């Protein structure tokens, strides 16, 4: 795997690649897990080359403590990428990415105001802006995103369509642990007792019951329920176990 620490080096290299070659792209913030690996493998099966990025994007954190405590595990992340078919990895720094000081932003004013957007003001502006920047840098044929962040996936699909971007957005199924808990970088921060509660969250959330009944059962376990909502035939949830925030969704 070839690693690029400098954006100018990447841009120069990208310009040398034949336009006849397909590029798959799976952007990440690091602290990788099996869910990320599934994106890399899906891309490597469908493209000549697979590109990823490691960048903890500050503009999508509405809580500064979350950004500060986000695990940085670069060596392990690069190893996982190498083992799962990534050919090129970009590791930009914040000054390179935000040369404008975040003066220019991508904003969506409908779906982006619901659920995650309602509870995390400004989050999706940061997500869409960094994804747009990375798309312009990588110029991928296809880009891969997990269904665990389904609202994010819908917004990226909408952005690409609205702005006439010639990129195919591929959705990949949520990867789950044996308990049914969705793989997430945040799972690593759970204590053993919190982990047991998180496993119960996954089981209860997937029950064939009303959102109100599910909320009541979760709250009885000491879980803080931010929202459980149904949207476009899916059920979405965001909860907090201690100070760890977890999200999930599934098709009804």
From Swiss-Prot:
Q: Where along this sequence does the record place binding of ATP? A: 29-36, 146-149, 175, 183-186
Catalytic activity of the protein = (R)-pantoate + beta-alanine + ATP = (R)-pantothenate + AMP + diphosphate + H(+)
Catalytic residues at 36 (proton donor)
Give a GO biological-process term: pantothenate biosynthetic process
Fetch the Pfam families from UniProt: Pantoate_ligase
Q: Where in the cell is it found?
A: Cytoplasm
| Main location as per UniProt | cytoplasm
In which pathway does this enzyme or protein participate?
Answer: Cofactor biosynthesis; (R)-pantothenate biosynthesis; (R)-pantothenate from (R)-pantoate and beta-alanine: step 1/1
The GO cellular component terms are:
cytosol
Asked if the record carries the keyword Ligase, the reply is: yes
Q: What is its EC number?
A: 6.3.2.1
The residues the record assigns to binding (R)-pantoate are: 60, 152
Q: Binding of beta-alanine: at which residues?
A: 60
* Molecular function GO terms recorded: ATP binding; pantoate-beta-alanine ligase activity
Family membership: Belongs to the pantothenate synthetase family.
Matching PANTHER family: CYTIDYLATE KINASE/PANTOATE-BETA-ALANINE LIGASE, PANTOATE--BETA-ALANINE LIGASE
Q: What does this protein do?
A: Catalyzes the condensation of pantoate with beta-alanine in an ATP-dependent reaction via a pantoyl-adenylate intermediate.
**Miscellaneous information on this protein:** The reaction proceeds by a bi uni uni bi ping pong mechanism.
Q: How does it assemble?
A: Homodimer.
What is the name attached to this protein's record?
Pantothenate synthetase
Q: Which species?
A: Legionella pneumophila subsp. pneumophila (strain Philadelphia 1 / ATCC 33152 / DSM 7513)
Q: What is the lineage of its organism?
A: Bacteria, Pseudomonadati, Pseudomonadota, Gammaproteobacteria, Legionellales
